[in-house]
Amino acid sequence: MTPQAAPAFLETDRLVLRPATAADAPDLLALDNDPAVMRYINGGRPTSAEDIRDRTLPRLLHDHACTGTRGYWIAREKDTGAFLGWFELRPLADHDAAVVELGYRLNRAAWGRGYATEGARALVDKGFTDLGVQRVTANTMAVNTGSRRVMEKAGLTFLRAYTEDWPEAIEGSEHGEVEYELTREAWQRGR
């Protein structure tokens, strides 16, 4: 099955989100080897094909019994089929869908075009309407203003700032991390 032919999990006006397959490895490798994309993840260091095969793909291919689906989806542009990156709506506890983490990693061609917000909003809605989610959480480095804006546009609100002890500090980590959240009740009020 080609990456474009995998069944869709969710469609928006401009996006198709579908489960990852092993055929996505080259696109994932290119995504994770862009220093700008990885700036707030690992400081922009390159990723090996072995890391994609042994770490990234198993994470993206994992099914969560509590939601009946995966926690990560490949994002493609609906009109062209172009690879944009991936989105995450993953249960924090594998046996319980109540609390999920929202995440996204898009290539630079997708930046500033509203794709991250569009995909995040659609996944949040899907989580609350179909997957039994009670709370969506998202985290990023405090200095990652682009990601923070996406969280806010997707309806999440600032919850807290905190610090982590990372094995390898990257530029900006000295400012700490932030957590955002959206509860089912707040989501329902905002509809």
Question: Residue spans of the language-model regions?
Answer:
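Helix C-cap/alpha-to-beta connector motif
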Residues: 62-66
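Short, high-confidence coil segments that cap the C-terminus of an alpha-helix
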Residues: 68-70, 133
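Conserved GNAT-fold acetyl-CoA-binding loop/helix
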Residues: 36-60, 70-71
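Catalytic Tyr-X3-Lys helix of short-chain dehydrogenase/reductase
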Residues: 60-61, 128
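Acyl-donor (CoA/ACP) binding surface of acyl/acetyltransferases
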Residues: 1-40, 76-191
